[in-house]
Amino acid sequence: MKRLLSLAIIASLAISYATPAVAIQESKVEVKHIKTEKVKPTTNKYEYVNLAFWRGFNDEHLNAYIVKALENNKDLKMASLTIEEFYQNVAAQRASQLPTINAGFLPGYSDIGAGAFDSYAVPLIASWELDIYGKNSNKTNSVRKLWESSILDERAAYISIASAVGSTYLNIVKLDAMIDLQEDIVKLRKEIFEMMEISNAEGLVSTSDLVKANQAYVAGVTDLTDMKKNRSKLLHQLAVLTGDSPNNIEEYARADYRTLAFSGNIPETVASEVIMQRPDYLKAEKMLEKAGIDVKVARKECLPSINLGGLVLFNAQHIGSLFNSNTALWGLGGGLLHPIFAGGKIKANLKSKKIAYEKSLRNYEKVNLTSMQEVNDSLVSVNMDKEKLAKQKEIQTLEQKDFELTKLKYQEGVIAKLDLNQKEENMLSVNQMVYASEFDCMVDYISYYKAVGAKTL
């Protein structure tokens, strides 16, 4: 009876680990198995963001915000936890390549007509699927590719957060400049309106011109309010990016907009190979490699599975004699099963994996094109905005000369104070335009930094 019991358990082990297999006609999808470099997590997260680039802005406040974001940003913490989660998935899948051993304790009580008695059993069951086709190791490699992809996602997140912090900070300093100049413009427009109000009372200025001056003053105040509102919103955004409370924005120091400048070098052209260091490009490669491995696994599901099983069973009426040699039995067995009919499941699974591979291939091609587009777009923005800034600085120089001449005329009594104020307002508007373009250029540098994966600059 015990022998029959042990054989039944071993047979059930063999059946439970058997894999259905049927003949499958190959589809027309050509699967190319690529091999990429292994990716491992780094303990120095600062390597992701290339701090040398940020030091090119020569701004200690910006550098401090970048470091603060790397240490406290919640998205980055979640990205790091995702890596650990996927690593545990790899460990769990790798365990399927090893034998499993289970133990149990089965107390019982029975009466078969000869008197009641107790019974105790302790089974030890071992099973192992022989990975002679490499199917389980392929499954482990497939899960490992997801883990490596999560590492690349973390790198992409670090670059993205650093870029967001830099762009947000520069736009805040840009608004500092706009607000400073706008306050001077509003002050001048108020003076112009007050002077025109006096002139209108004396009949020297028409009511229509007075209304226009008042409209310009009110519009200037409205623009100033919008600028302050946008700056507060950006400060809130910077606080969240750095893992801080938006209630602390009054403590956020910035550089003087008159001195902030980028001393780094951005090339006018770049080789197309630069996209190969972007984390999204590398991830697309990993996912394509994973899809190829999944097709391998699906093909190997067609093959029979070979399993080994073992049983040691201790069975006695008294618990004290449970582990005696005469109460034990053991057995070894194996199984090889190749079912004839599986309802088309294996064939459908293989086709599904090939479709997934083709989707990964198309995504890889798309990422390739999108990466080149983003690099080219960033270079066009850098070069064109530099050219625009150069022209605007020429206009600024001419406007400054014109204003100096106007001041001389006013000092000589040739023109009125109203004319001088209007000319000064024009100069301030041009200064706003130039500062805006300067900061737009610096934001373009950050876009290029992000487009090339924060590596080659």
Residue ranges of predicted features:
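Amphipathic alpha-helical coiled-coil segments
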Residues: 78-93, 157, 161-184, 188-198, ...
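Metallo-beta-lactamase
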Residues: 227, 279-280, 360, 437
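Small/polar (Gly/Ser/Thr/Ala-rich) solvent-exposed segments
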Residues: 77, 97-119, 127-156, 160, ...
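Short, solvent-exposed, mixed-charge loop/turn linkers that connect secondary-structure elements
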Residues: 206, 225-275, 416, 443-457
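Membrane-embedded beta-strand positions in outer-membrane beta-barrel channels/transporters
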Residues: 66, 123-125, 169, 271, ...
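Transmembrane beta-barrel architecture of outer-membrane proteins
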Residues: 62-64, 78, 119-121, 167, ...
